[in-house]
From Swiss-Prot:
Coiled coil: none annotated. Zn(2+) 2 binds at residues 98, 101, 104, 112. Homotetramer. It comes from Candida albicans (strain SC5314 / ATCC MYA-2876). Binds 2 Zn(2+) ions per subunit. This is Alcohol dehydrogenase 2. The keyword Zinc applies. Its cofactor is Zn(2+). It catalyses: a primary alcohol + NAD(+) = an aldehyde + NADH + H(+); a secondary alcohol + NAD(+) = a ketone + NADH + H(+). GO terms for molecular function: alcohol dehydrogenase (NAD+) activity; zinc ion binding. It is an enzyme of class 1 (oxidoreductase). It comes from the Eukaryota. Its EC number is 1.1.1.1. Keywords: Cytoplasm, Metal-binding, NAD, Oxidoreductase, Zinc.
Amino acid sequence: MSVPTTQKAVIFETNGGKLEYKDIPVPKPKANELLINVKYSGVCHTDLHAWKGDWPLATKLPLVGGHEGAGVVVALGENVKGWKVGDYAGVKWLNGSCLNCEYCQSGAEPNCAEADLSGYTHDGSFQQYATADAVQAARIPAGTDLANVAPILCAGVTVYKALKTAELEAGQWVAISGAAGGLGSLAVQYAKAMGYRVLAIDGGEDKGEFVKSLGAETFIDFTKEKDVVEAVKKATNGGPHGVINVSVSERAIGQSTEYVRTLGKVVLVGLPAGAKISTPVFDAVIKTIQIKGSYVGNRKDTAEAVDFFTRGLIKCPIKIVGLSELPEVYKLMEEGKILGRYVLDNDK
């Protein structure tokens, strides 16, 4: 398969600096890597943080962001096995890990101290050709709609892992805070597919209609409710058994520790810059609640999340725009005006 020497990409030289849509060299895969012709790439809040540089983890510079890339393998490093040119593959957040530490050996590769992160420490999917470690690259079944599967590679895997972390049983209530966004809209669907009752929390009537169309049983509009905590408790007859916090609101996270049911689990996913969680110790002990962080999933979680999608149980509410329009997508993201997930067509 013919591979060009240059490609279109969006790159920045400094954190918060100009996002340049321009020609850059096509990378050459290392011995353990795939070269993937990225057809589509989802846009995640993490990409916005990587550009701004407002997380306590330094990015490489200059940097090509993006970590939800779906495409076709066009070249293989000499040590790669189990892949062939023409396979569908995904660039996900975890680009590679050491595979030798205690975390990698126990299936917690995302927690590896030497983890290489797409669109953060490794040039990501906001380019037409990207490299990915052959062990960690996502396997996508042939014939899959690449535009629609792209958000599954991070957003889908992330919320699916969070729901597993909540350790709920079928028929129990789960509250999803930030339910209409890119992560939340997928969390609602995965929760429904896993047999849970879904209470969605977000702001605006249009968002209520949207999340109910995805499977939410109840919607709480935080812009209209005077007491969100009591409203959630009332709607779920005592509070949800689990909460998935994909919201980037520190206040919403705090409220979740108040309305979660006794013996319930609060799972933290969204990463508001500089945020802290605060809850009365007395209440946490008496209610015996658990507060858990949930990062991205491992290879098994990825395969399972993709399987839900390929079986038609998850629909990605996406809007496709050109790669060159990434700065406008970031602006909408900062203004909180995004329903579902924006996906970039890397050929535009």
